[in-house]
Curated annotation (Swiss-Prot):
Present with 78 molecules/cell in log phase SD medium. It is a peripheral membrane protein. It comes from Saccharomyces cerevisiae (strain ATCC 204508 / S288c). The RIC1-RGP1 complex acts as a guanine nucleotide exchange factor (GEF), which activates YPT6 by exchanging bound GDP for free GTP. It is thereby required for efficient fusion of endosome-derived vesicles with the Golgi. The RIC1-RGP1 participates in the recycling of SNC1, presumably by mediating fusion of endosomal vesicles with the Golgi compartment. May also be indirectly involved in the transcription of both ribosomal protein genes and ribosomal RNA. This is Guanine nucleotide exchange factor subunit RIC1. Belongs to the RIC1 family. Highly divergent. GO terms for biological process: intracellular protein transport; retrograde transport, endosome to Golgi. GO terms for cellular component: cis-Golgi network; cytosol; Golgi apparatus; Golgi membrane; guanyl-nucleotide exchange factor complex; Ric1-Rgp1 guanyl-nucleotide exchange factor complex. Forms a complex with RGP1. The keyword Flavoprotein does not apply. InterPro entries: Ric1 (IPR040096), RIC1_C (IPR009771). Pfam families: RIC1. The lineage of its organism: Eukaryota, Fungi, Dikarya, Ascomycota, Saccharomycotina.
Length: 1056
């Protein structure tokens, strides 16, 4: 590959330019999907290295210029920046390509010092009190001025760099699919005015193969292009390329400071002087205070100082400027909130923080303070600590990689960890040296990149557009491709939600716990979008209730795709401006759409379940439309399909109530629109077809209510109409909005520290609260009662879905090593925890049995509870009563099971899983002996349970069995257990050893097993029964090694 390097101490482009024809995609903007959460690796990372310096520093220099100190992205310019002690490297982010660099000379290093760190001048899309107004923040979203970043040196100089690139946010989004815009806040006129001619031949860079000038290597794909204008235009593969655009890097000015620069923030503002102009605001933290500098045309125009002592970090959080300092004597961290206009400081202490803080972050309006062994989340609104947690390792690096996920690097600089904001682990890399020794045992290997990955020491990382870049002190960097969750925000209370992941390779992963669906419930189904381009931004992926229809919106290309999962047919609708979409039941799609004039409306589309007609336009499917009032900002749209349909009492013209079920009108769902002024609830009125499908007849505006002051409408993630009120999930809290006696409305916070709603199915809601998986009934949640169950979340097993019918939680786990990465679904039954919680609350045993006995894992749950209580030497009274109730006749379902079938199965499985020294605790409370168990199996012809018990007895040595079945004082330590021990020693019939020597009983057992095997119609059951017979013959032989009895002969005689 031919790359022209820079030889002077000035930034230059590293690529040769070549003209290229592009077609600019037109169309209006759309709201980007903000409901992104989980991240998982697609594969192990690709390991790369930065190039060496072009000009040598000179002999005797001890600077290690391979040390990558920091990495940073400028998303609005599709740029990645890497900083070394003497260089600034500018990469085109997508596709990855080095396009410019600045190499500092020895004279520059001696005068200004080595590079230490860097900060970008960031356009904030929110208010900063005293700096950026609401109007300015919206304007700066689109007109962001110059691309500026600052490099701090170890001699307290600021090197101010500018990147000149002919691009806008709109173009970066459309051409590369990088989500850098929020178009809903901008008018169509502003969006179009920001566009320019992207076909500029002088902007496109092309890399040629140095051995063949006709072979172009540009974005990782080698394409041979013959000369000739017509062929160049007609080459179809050319359309799939992503262009690498020219940029220019300039060092504009060097700022000198007399004090140590501890930290700084760069902010863009828009001056109101004259016609207005862009200004750079530098907020620099010194040991003596915080200095605010206003820079216009790279000259300081204004300066002010706020006195803050011993500051270590500065940050903008929840529209406020803050400085953090640490008091090692008092062992506390001070959060100083700065009032810029009044030049005042409000100090709030965070106690019990003995360590120096590493860094601080802003996550969803909360201040996250990171220490080496602890992370604290501070609520800046109420000025109190929300929660804190400790990872099981010492932290070296921590930063957020999206609004929900923190990436932590351990002190060994090797392993990375994806944590949720409440400290639940999603994924971690733990490299085992054995993974590398087999492939790297060649000492003569020339390429050190093939050495063990454990040698890679991370110094920094950045994440953008489902790609994670980690850099190291050795000059190497890793490129990770990630799966990203697309949250399913619609709820069908009759069916569980799907879990959906996407990547940048046009792949979509779907998991559904529904066993009867076309999606395999044990595997993750991968769907490939019908495109070869790699610049698609997938804003939404939604699956309907029956798991037959799949809707995807590619927002940077204005394309809505609908896929039939059964027929594998795609329908494509171009030039659509979709801001949000939700499935309503099986075949209705509710869309929030933007029109050409900038107005928005809601549309309900009736999508055919069978193969769609390719000639039909999307507008032909519209069956309902609601125009959003002008100047109204829509924050979110919510669709809930109800579990219990509400019958509407409608009277005909002759005042006779209609009693025909097919014509009965039902409220089957609700659509809730949350705006900046009010919440609007639409009832969906339907009839139910005999096949089970809902047929929508009308949309009725049921309720309009003003948003309460203490609920931020832009934070609402879910809402439901309940008991003539509303239940919100907003800002990590469940908030109840109900009517009061005076006719007004009152809010009540029901739960806090809510991380995620897993699902809402029938009358139950499943959430992650802190470190726990919590199940509530909606009624209990509304009435502020206790949850049904709360279960700690295991590390690396985060719940993604649930199946109430089996009381099972489905979790996602990543199998990862140096060679491959694979996502697998694991299943955890929580029914035992649910029953145990009921027992602890002294719930009536009959109610527990009635509510849960028909769940599939019920017997397993009882067995698990019994085993746990035995091992803890707890009372077995309640659980044994519950086990015996399982075999009672059920009058409701007219079922009469065998008298002790369930109990025998539970007891035998429990004995199989606990040590023999605990058996007597069970037998004593059960008031049965081992002989009684075997006799009961024979009496009720329970061959399977009989076989299980025999196999349990066979697994123990005769001497050990006898020793274990005698209680020892040290084991139990009570007078009761001592008495039981003496009693069990005296009575030989309680000894399993003597029991197995009972000839007549063994013959009865063998007869039952042989009869069961001979009469079995199921081949598997027959095989199991014969296996048990052979095991019993082996037992009889072992018990009569000296051939003193006639056991075997009697057994044979019985079957002649």
């Amino acid at each position: 590959m031919f790359i022209k390097q820079s030889e002077k101490n000035t930034p230059k482009c590293l690529y040769k330019k070549k003209g290229k024809v592009r077609v600019l995609l037109t169309g209006s903007c759309k709201k980007l999907n903000t409901w992104k959460m989980h991240l998982w690796p697609v594969s192990p990372p690709q390991l790369l290295r930065i190039p060496p310096r072009n000009a040598e520093l000179g002999e005797g220099t001890k600077i290690d210029d391979c040390n990558i100190l920091q990495s940073m992205t400028l998303p609005q310019a599709n740029v990645l920046i890497m900083l070394t002690p003497t260089r600034v490297l500018i990469y085109n982010f997508k596709p990855m390509a080095l396009v410019a660099s600045h190499e500092r000379t020895m004279a520059s290093l001696k005068e200004f010092g080595d590079n230490r760190s860097m900060k970008r001048s960031a356009p904030y899309n929110d208010i900063i009190e005293g700096l950026i107004s609401k109007k300015d923040s919206q304007y700066l979203l689109w007109h962001q001025g110059k691309l500026i970043f600052y490099v701090m040196t170890d001699k307290n100089f600021l090197l101010t760099y500018q990147i000149l690139k002919n691009c806008t946010n709109e173009i970066i989004f459309k051409e590369y699919g990088i989500p850098v815009i929020e178009p809903l806040l901008m008018s169509e006129e502003e969006a179009n005015s920001a566009e320019y001619d992207y076909n500029n031949d002088d902007d496109t860079l092309t890399v040629f193969d140095k051995n063949s000038s006709s072979r172009i290597i540009q974005n990782g794909f080698g394409i041979t292009k013959e000369k000739g204008f017509l062929h160049f235009l007609s080459n179809q593969e050319n359309i799939d390329e992503l262009p690498v655009k020219k940029l220019e890097l300039r060092l504009k000015v060097v700022l000198k400071f007399d004090y140590e620069i501890i930290d700084m923030i760069g902010i863009k503002t828009f001056s109101k002087v004259g016609d207005g102009r862009y200004e750079e605001v530098l907020i620099v933290l010194f040991p003596h205070g915080l200095q605010i500098l206003t820079i216009s045309d790279f000259k300081v125009s204004k300066s002010s100082l706020v006195e803050v002592k011993k500051g270590s970090k500065t940050i903008v959080c929840n529209k406020q400027l803050m400085v953090l300092s640490h008091d090692s004597v008092e062992k506390q961290t001070i959060v100083s909130i700065i009032d810029i206009e009044k030049q005042a400081v409000e100090a709030i202490p965070l106690t019990d923080t003995p360590d120096e803080l590493l860094t601080c972050l802003e996550v969803n309006g909360y201040l996250v303070v990171v220490y080496k062994e602890k992370i604290i989340c501070f609520d800046t609104r109420i000025k109190k600590v929300s929660h804190s947690w400790k990872p099981p390792f010492v932290i070296k690096l921590c930063d957020k990689i999206n609004d929900k996920i923190l990436l932590l690097v351990s002190e060994d600089s090797v392993n990375i960890h994806f944590y949720t904001e409440f400290g639940n682990l999603l994924f971690a890399t733990y490299f085992d040296e054995d993974d590398y020794n087999g492939d790297n045992n060649n000492d003569n290997s020339k390429d050190k990149n093939e050495k063990k990955a454990a040698e890679y020491k991370i110094s920094d990382f950045v994440c953008l557009d489902k790609s994670l870049i980690t850099v190291s002190h050795s000059g190497k960097y890793q490129v990770w491709k990630l799966w990203e969750e697309i949250k399913q925000t619609q709820f069908d209370f009759r069916n569980p939600k799907c879990y959906v992941l996407t990547n940048t390779n046009n792949d979509v992963i779907i998991y559904s716990p529904v066993t009867s669906s076309s999606i395999n419930n044990d595997n993750l189904q991968v769907i490939k979008l019908p495109t070869k381009t790699f610049n698609n931004h997938i804003a939404f992926v939604k699956i309907n209730s029956s798991l037959r229809l799949f809707a995807t919106y590619v927002s940077n290309k204005n394309i809505l795709l609908i896929h039939n999962l059964e027929t594998n047919m795609w329908s494509s609708f171009a030039d659509q401006n979709v801001l949000d979409l939700h499935w309503l039941g099986d075949n209705y799609l509710v869309c929030h759409m933007k029109n050409d004039d900038g107005s928005t409306n809601l549309k309900c589309l009736q999508i055919p379940l069978q193969e769609a007609n390719p000639d039909v336009e999307l507008s032909d499917y519209v069956m309902w439309e609601y125009n959003v009032p002008e100047n109204t900002i829509v924050f979110s749209l919510h669709v809930n399909t109800l579990s219990r349909y509400k019958l509407l009492k409608m009277k005909s013209k002759n005042h006779n109530a209609s009693e025909k079920q097919p014509d009965a009108l039902l409220k089957t769902a609700e659509i809730i629109l949350v705006t900046d002024t009010q919440t609007i609830v639409f009832d969906v009125i339907s009839t139910v077809h005999p096949c089970g499908l809902n047929i929508i007849k009308k949309f009725y505006q049921y309720l309009k209510i003003n948003i309460p002051i203490d609920v931020l409408p832009n934070k609402i993630e879910w809402i439901i109409n309940m008991k003539e009120g509303l239940l919100f999930f907003a800002d990590r809290k469940f908030i109840k909005l109900g009517k009061v006696d005076g006719g007004g409305w009152q809010t009540l916070t029901l739960l806090d520290n809510i991380e995620k709603i897993i699902d809402v199915i029938r009358d139950e809601i499943f959430v992650v609260q802190g470190h726990n998986y919590v199940v509530y009934s909606l009624e209990d949640l509304w009435d502020d009662k206790k949850p049904l169950v709360s279960i700690p979340i295991e590390e690396d097993l985060y719940p993604i879905s649930t199946t109430p019918e089996t009381a099972t939680t489905h979790t996602l786990h990543c199998i990862f090593n140096a060679r491959f990465s694979k996502l697998v679904v694991k299943h955890q039954i929580y029914l035992d925890q649910l029953i145990l919680a009921k027992l602890e609350d002294n719930t009536d045993l009959e109610d527990i049995s009635h509510n849960y006995r028909f769940l599939k894992p019920y017997k397993f749950a009882l067995e698990k509870i019994l085993s746990t209580k035995i091992l803890r030497s707890d009372s077995l009274d309640d659980i044994l009563k519950l086990i015996k109730m399982y075999d009672n006749t059920d009058p409701e379902h007219n079922i009469s099971p065998p008298t002790h079938s369930g109990m025998l199965e539970i007891i035998s499985n429990c004995l199989r899983k606990i040590e023999t020294k605990y058996w007597n605790h069970l037998f004593t409370n059960l008031k049965m002996t081992p002989r009684d168990l075997l006799a009961l199996c024979i009496e009720e012809n329970e061959a399977k349970m009989l076989g299980v018990l025999l196999l349990v007895f066979l697994n123990y040595d005769e001497k050990d069995l006898g020793d274990d079945l005698h209680f020892k004082k040290s084991d139990l330590g009570t007078e009761e257990s001592k008495a039981l021990n003496d009693n069990s020693t005296k009575k030989s019939e309680k000894s399993v050893t003597n029991l197995l020597k009972d000839e007549e009983l063994m013959l009865k057992v063998l007869e039952l097993l042989v009869t069961s095997a001979a009469n079995a119609t199921d081949p598997i059951k027959a095989t199991d029964s014969w296996d048990m017979c052979f095991q019993l013959i082996r037992l009889l032989k072992e018990l009569d090694r000296e051939n003193n009895t006639q056991l075997v002969q009697k057994a044979l005689e019985r079957f002649k």
